[in-house]
Amino acid sequence: MEPIEDLDVLAEDEVRQREADGEVDEDLDRVKHGYDATAGDKQVYIETYGCQMNVNDSGIVASVLEESGYGLTRDQAAADVVLLNTCAIRENAERKIRARLSMLRSEKEKRDGELMLGVLGCMAERLREKLLEQEDLVDVVVGPDAYRDLPQLLYEADATGQAAVNVELSKQETYEDIQPVRYDSNGVSAYVSIMRGCDNMCTFCVVPFTRGREESRPVTTILSEVARLAEEGYKEVTLLGQNVNSYHYTDADGTSVSFAELVDRVSRVSPEMRVRYSTSHPKDCTDDLLKVHRDRPNVCNYIHLPVQHGNTEVLDRMRRTYTREEYLALTERAKELCPGVSLSTDLIAGFCGETEAQHEDTLSLMEEVRYDHAYMFKYSERPQTYAARKYEDDVPEDTKQRRLEEIIELQNQHAKESNEAEVGRVHTVLVEGPSKKSDAQFFGRTDTNKGVVFDREDYEKGDYVRVRIEDCTSSTLLGTAIEKTTLEAAARTDSITTSPAVA
């Protein structure tokens, strides 16, 4: 997934720049959930690492525990149970979680065994034996498909003093009947899980081994959740799945719903609610889906299309199922059907066997597409994957690092030029909350997923505001508010075509 928009995340220098600008999102590499403390015999504190799906899963965990009488707290010191919802997508993520467990070990010792620790999610599924053998401080180890059993597992671990484990993957579990606790206190944007698992088996990716096979959630439960969020005042939903655009559900009466049809139906729940999704696979990005972007004004004009690499031979080794030429044709089709569309991607430097010429192909593809955003990484070998079993991780670390830095440098240049081109244009911005630099300013996003800062004046969180872009940094647009609007009104009046800048 997008490195949570899939975060998972950004290249380190882009994070530093966005932090310097004061507009970097909450670092989803580690999210301390801001649950309000609730009554309960035992208090639970949850930390989440990784992608948007993990964030949503933590909301499911919170809901399950509340139903069983647990309280939720934002104060770790007040917690009887600390749960780490983990990510296994890269080695660095696992190192961070191990370091966090080491810190918690000393705290557990200080509390003389009164603190229970749990490891949830992808790392729990992948490393269950090592967690139990090497991290003997862990009381529960629970995989992504076993969260309904968490209250019972906590009870068993507490009663017996022995670690309780359930990491079984399920072909049916979608948690369709559970409403996640919305830890995001802004009340503006919410995640809605529509499917789980992945069937693609890319050679570098551990997700199919930690999340299991694809299982789509019933359409009716998705639409009900979105409708409930609209009633609660949310203005944006992001549909989530490991491979979200492979969504396909068949009702008991035989009626089949594709992802394009689902997005269209979600967009009709409330014309004043923006719709996004993450993360998609290029092979499943159809004309029907692109036409929904074009025809439905509240479906954001932003598509995440992870290419991973710019060379066809490397893409074949990655088992991505498309060629460089096919991918480029898709991006051209997206730009043709959806004028002004913003494209983002994932890029891996130094995959097994990558030559200098193949690396140059990635750079040249970037020049052709000119992404607005990118999530960029060095290749990190993951156990269990086909690449770990069959390919040699033969690109030296210093070469990987140098190639990654070249990718980052080029992407930063493209992002800067893209933002500079926005000066003088008017965008509809959804206000997410105060700017991190100043309470006198608001921060929000365009439907092309660009961050915008402007003086807050009399506007409120959750408003749609027409903003003229006056200036920019490499990561943020700076604007002047024109007026409050609605999505329906903006569809008639807003434009992303260049207009004269205010003198």
UniProtKB/Swiss-Prot annotation:
Its main location: cytoplasm. Residues 42-159 form the MTTase N-terminal domain. [4Fe-4S] cluster 1 binds at C51, C87, C122. Binds 2 [4Fe-4S] clusters. One cluster is coordinated with 3 cysteines and an exchangeable S-adenosyl-L-methionine. GO terms for molecular function: 4 iron, 4 sulfur cluster binding; metal ion binding; N6-isopentenyladenosine methylthiotransferase activity. GO terms for cellular component: cytosol. [4Fe-4S] cluster 2 binds at C198, C202, C205. Residues 420-483 form the TRAM domain. It is an enzyme of class 2 (transferase). It comes from the Bacteria. Catalyzes the methylthiolation of N6-(dimethylallyl)adenosine (i(6)A), leading to the formation of 2-methylthio-N6-(dimethylallyl)adenosine (ms(2)i(6)A) at position 37 in tRNAs that read codons beginning with uridine. Belongs to the methylthiotransferase family. MiaB subfamily. This is tRNA-2-methylthio-N(6)-dimethylallyladenosine synthase. It comes from Salinibacter ruber (strain DSM 13855 / M31). The lineage of its organism: Bacteria, Pseudomonadati, Rhodothermota, Rhodothermia, Rhodothermales.
